[in-house]
């Protein structure tokens, strides 16, 4: 196991003065646990909410670590955007990552995952599963990871001053160091915050038995320099009934990255050899400028949550000359996805037991390649091509040359109304959502369509600690824009078929919750069907004159989740399990639905467990947690998964188990200062996560140390 304990001890001594300084200046800080109420999901049971306090008591530096106790979520291998995620087996094509209610469903390239926010900047993370109710927002077919960023008011709670400074630092024995600072304050009705965090990670070592293409123990090109900051200014007025917040967040990854970030590098005979993977310096950036307003007691409107945002995803590569997906651009290459959106969410009380939720959502996305390259389109003639075939190729080239390409765009608009009524131990929910989309592909073609999506739910509380729930929700998701990196046109025109509709999910779910303060249990069973499943053209390597995005079949998924916890005194014990079985039924002649991880993955039944004890004096918690994934067989494609020779593959993902031990010490006896230690993957297990393909694995044994 790669655990340099002597370096850890040295770092502890080095930071001792920093602890004392923090204790002196922030002795009265008391951060409350953030309680999230009503995430606009109606009667849907929600699980696994990570609060600011829980985050501060962990060594997590990414969402994979922060959410590892949620069995329904699986993260792939690698670092940064090398990782894919699945939620109930469904991939990033239909799972959103929302930060301060800003989100985009466009991707840079199908060989890399979506950008996930730095947890150092957030105060709470929740998980929405399955198709959402009417108020869940645009495209809520398969759930979301929802994060809210921290602000000055959160950090000022409990202080006897109107300003403060927070410092944090961390060290990972498996080649990583992190540090950051936050400055925050309040003057009159105004408050502000600036927070900066850096996590500098070198190539990490995988588990015992792993060897890379050069015979070494490290995973090639897994190093990343992650830098993020958050700036916020807010004002509260009207006796606290009104609040306006303007924020800007930027999160950036820098490093030497491969063409296909989900893969590392294989030997010379491999399809992912060093020549095809062509590592180059790259920067991937996500920024969000957000203006938010919260108002209470506005006459008929009891509460209003509104925001407007500009979300940008940028990719910069120092040289893409060996990257065919990027058009083989020599020298610097820039790609950008810009999303502008607004949300207005109203709550009105019709009667003492009836709450009415209603609102509108708007989102416009635009992809901006560095240049359009359709003038360089070329179809290579086969070695024994006939004159007629060559003539056809030249004609197809002329078709592509004739197009005047423009930035592809998509606009989604939605409106909803939802009523929640309480009567005699029952909470009844009913809603209706209207969604409309308009897509313009880079050839100028436009397609639009609308859909109505009802939702129903009931919660029954027969006794004080029990409740049972059922929901039946419909949600739709518009066609995704084609990969931003490939909109240049050098490999042909990507259009959209006439009559293309939004795919539509129907999710039926039953569940229960029990919580008496000591023992708690919850569970759910779901069945989901998605009609008119969407797919972009999947053959991204060949030069074809014109290809189209289409509706191409349907998807079915079913599964269950169970969880239980026991708390008494300082003892906390938890256990959870999740199982899902997504299957894709492709009705298109060209079989466009794919087993690529952007669509989903058949993950094995996943178990999580943890046991911890917190002592009163000293205020110290020590614990263990485990994540165990059973073997998974079969493809998500109902017809089976074929290799490059057209033969059916026997898809098997091996099971694995990973154990961690952790500790949290509060030297001042409260949340003012946290000193965290964890030993992740104690037994140095070498394994491949189920949401990933081929060669990217996760870190082996790792000692992590952090304070905040």
Identify the function of each model-found stretch:
Residues 352-353, 422-428, 518-521, 525-530, ...:
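Gram-negative outer-membrane beta-barrel transporters
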Residues 240-302, 312-336:
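Flexible loop and strand-edge segments within Gram-negative outer membrane beta-barrel domains
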Residues 271-298, 335, 404, 408-410, ...:
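Outer-membrane beta-barrel signature, preferentially recognizing the C-terminal barrel domain
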Residues 252-254, 261, 265, 312-314, ...:
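Surface-exposed extracellular loop regions of Gram-negative outer-membrane beta-barrel proteins
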Residues 9, 23, 227, 234-238, ...:
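Conserved C-terminal beta-signal and adjacent last beta-strands/turns
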């Amino acid at each position: 196991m790669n655990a340099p304990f002597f370096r850890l001890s040295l770092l502890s001594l080095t930071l001792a003065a920093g602890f004392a300084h923090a204790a002196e200046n922030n002795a009265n800080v008391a951060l409350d646990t953030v309680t999230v109420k009503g995430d606009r999901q109606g009667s849907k049971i929600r699980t696994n909410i990570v609060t600011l306090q829980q985050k501060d008591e962990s060594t997590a530096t990414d969402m994979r670590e922060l959410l590892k106790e949620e069995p329904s979520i699986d993260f792939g291998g690698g670092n940064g955007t090398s990782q894919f995620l699945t939620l109930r087996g469904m991939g990033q094509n239909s799972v959103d990552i929302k930060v301060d209610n800003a989100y985009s469903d466009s991707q840079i390239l199908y060989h890399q995952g979506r950008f996930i926010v730095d947890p150092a900047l957030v105060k709470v993370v929740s998980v929405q599963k399955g198709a959402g109710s009417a108020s869940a927002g645009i495209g809520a077919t398969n759930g979301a990871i929802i994060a809210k960023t921290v602000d000055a008011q959160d950090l000022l709670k409990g202080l006897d001053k109107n300003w403060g400074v927070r410092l944090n630092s961390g060290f990972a024995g498996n080649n990583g160091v992190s540090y950051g600072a936050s400055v925050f304050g309040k003057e009159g009705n105004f408050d502000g915050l600036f927070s900066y965090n850096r996590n500098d990670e070198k190539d990490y070592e995988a588990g015992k038995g792993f060897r890379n293409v050069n015979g070494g123990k490290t995973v090639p090109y897994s190093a990343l320099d992650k830098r993020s900051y958050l700036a916020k200014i807010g004002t509260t007025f009207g006796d606290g009934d009104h609040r306006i917040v303007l924020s800007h967040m930027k999160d950036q990854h820098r490093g030497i990255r491969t063409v296909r970030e989900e893969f590392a590098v294989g030997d010379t005979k491999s399809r992912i050899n060093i020549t095809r993977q062509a590592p180059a310096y790259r920067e991937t950036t996500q920024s969000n400028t957000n203006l938010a307003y919260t108002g209470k007691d506005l006459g008929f409107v009891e509460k209003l949550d509104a925001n407007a945002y500009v979300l940008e995803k940028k990719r910069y590569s120092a040289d893409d000359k060996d990257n065919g997906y990027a058009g083989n651009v020599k020298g610097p290459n820039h790609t950008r996805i810009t999303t502008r959106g607004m949300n207005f969410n109203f709550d009105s009380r019709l009667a003492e037991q009836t709450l009415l939720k209603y609102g509108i959502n708007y989102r416009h996305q635009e992809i901006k390649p560095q240049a359009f390259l359709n003038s360089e389109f070329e179809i290579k003639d086969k070695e024994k091509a006939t004159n007629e075939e060559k003539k056809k190729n030249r004609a197809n080239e002329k078709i592509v040359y004739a197009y005047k390409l423009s930035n592809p765009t998509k606009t989604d608009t939605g409106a909803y109304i939802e009523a929640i009524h309480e009567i005699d131990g029952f909470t009844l929910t009913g809603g209706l959502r209207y969604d409309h989309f308009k897509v313009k592909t880079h050839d100028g073609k436009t397609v639009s369509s609308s859909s109505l999506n009802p939702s129903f739910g009931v919660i029954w509380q027969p006794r004080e600690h029990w409740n049972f729930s059922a929901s039946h929700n419909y949600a739709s998701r518009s066609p995704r824009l084609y990969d931003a990196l490939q909109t240049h046109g050098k490999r042909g025109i990507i259009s959209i078929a006439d009559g293309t509709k939004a795919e539509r999910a129907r999710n039926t779910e039953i569940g229960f919750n029990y919580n008496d303060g000591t023992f708690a249990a919850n569970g759910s069973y779901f069945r989901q069907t998605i009609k008119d499943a969407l797919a972009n053209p999947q053959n991204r390597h060949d030069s074809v004159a014109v290809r189209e995005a289409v509706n191409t079949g349907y998807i079915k998924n079913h599964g269950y989740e169970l969880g239980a916890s026991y708390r008494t005194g300082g003892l906390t014990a938890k256990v959870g399990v999740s199982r899902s079985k997504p299957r894709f039924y492709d009705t298109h002649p060209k079989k466009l639905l794919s087993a690529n991880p952007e669509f989903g993955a058949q993950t094995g039944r996943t178990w999580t467990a943890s046991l911890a004890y917190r002592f009163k004096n000293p205020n110290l918690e020590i614990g263990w947690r485990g994540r165990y994934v059973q073997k998974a067989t079969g493809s998500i494609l109902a017809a089976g998964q074929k290799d490059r020779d057209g033969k059916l593959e026997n898809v098997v993902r091996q099971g694995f188990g990973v154990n961690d031990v952790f500790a949290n010490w509060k030297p001042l006896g409260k949340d003012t200062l946290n000193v965290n230690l964890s030993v992740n993957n104690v037994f140095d297990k070498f394994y491949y996560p189920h949401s990933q393909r081929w060669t990217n694995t996760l870190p082996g044994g790792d000692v992590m140390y952090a304070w905040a």
